[in-house]
Amino acid sequence: MSQHCDDLMTFLNESSSPFHAVSALAARLQKAGFTQIKQLDDVVLSPGSGYFVTANDSSIIAFRAGHGQPTDGLRIIGAHTDSPNLSVKPNPVKKRSGVVQLAVDVYGGALLNPWFDRDLSLAGRVSFVDQSGQLASRLIDFRRPIAIIPSLAIHLDRDANKNRSINPQTDILPILAGLSEDDATDFDLSVLLANQISSEYEDCSDVRVLDFELSLYDCQDASLVGLDNSFLASARLDNLLSCHAGLQALLAASDAYWSLLVCNDHEEVGSASSVGAQGPMLTDVLEFIAGSAAASRKLRDQSTMLSVDNAHAVHPNFSDRHDESHGPILNRGPVVKINRNQRYATSGEGSALMRLLAERTGVPLQHFVVRTDLGCGSTIGPITAAETGIRTIDLGLPTLAMHSIRELAGCADVEYLDRLLTAFYNRVA
């Protein structure tokens, strides 16, 4: 197993929610000597040092202070911390047919069929009043199977394999617990969450839960797949794979240059939030680095960004869903994503830069253009380019089953991407 895939799988298993992903990224940054900034104005940057800032516990920006002037330009890599999931509603508990169920919302464009018959757990952030009467929040993760969404037996729906649609309001409520016939005790989710907080945090006993941001996830760990272990199967490859690759590149980057990694939340639902790509987080940090609004404009004019998000690999059973000349293949290298209608931010000059960078790095490079008769997804790339004016290139790793509960990528591609992003930071081209 390559070290690249090994560490990525560890990160994926740790990152059961965007909150946990940012926590895992921050821990790796601190271990590497990066300093967390609480208030931007209170810090004097030291050349060669690393810094990071978080927002809402679900977005993070990390950067290296180079030895040159930041107004000469930064190399920026952007990714996102969120993935499609089933999010627990505020008043979710339902008791019927002898079981306790949770009502859920669909977050983002989730592929729903694969969520059935999986061992599911629960993770996220819980807000509560502590013993001193203060409002506080903590991350929790049950890290064991506590829920499941059983399929309807084919005997009760003979057309299931031909024509079964899913109603997200009624069909995907997970079972959480059983109820005995004479059970008069109300199931209390707040008590369950309070007990989980107490079990994870010694200083948080006897808390009163007020609210939560929780989502379900598949308990199965990331794993290598194939006779030759050439594939990686996991939840949340879109887009934690890119967050991890950006982090690895930043840690390996030369401190001679200014380099920055931004991992935003809320990409899967449009990025229009205070911590999404459409929010002020990146522009605020860039102005802090530059020292003034005027200097920030010069910095942004001289900077280049890679928006790194997964690309659709050709599915061998559905190869007609791709343009025949622009179909990425697993383990054949990262993918430059192009859309002339600006669903991706890549220009001809940006694509040329990536071709030269890949050539000098010895990394194979592929290109993706969606079929002309199909709609095209988007990324944080066009949004960040529009908000900042920074030249942006959309890049990604070929992936199958995108937005499923479990996605598939190539192990060789993971190493290719790490090398390419490190070379980007180091100005190889």
Predicted regions and their residues:
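N-terminal hydrophobic/helix-forming segments and targeting peptides
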Residues: 1-429
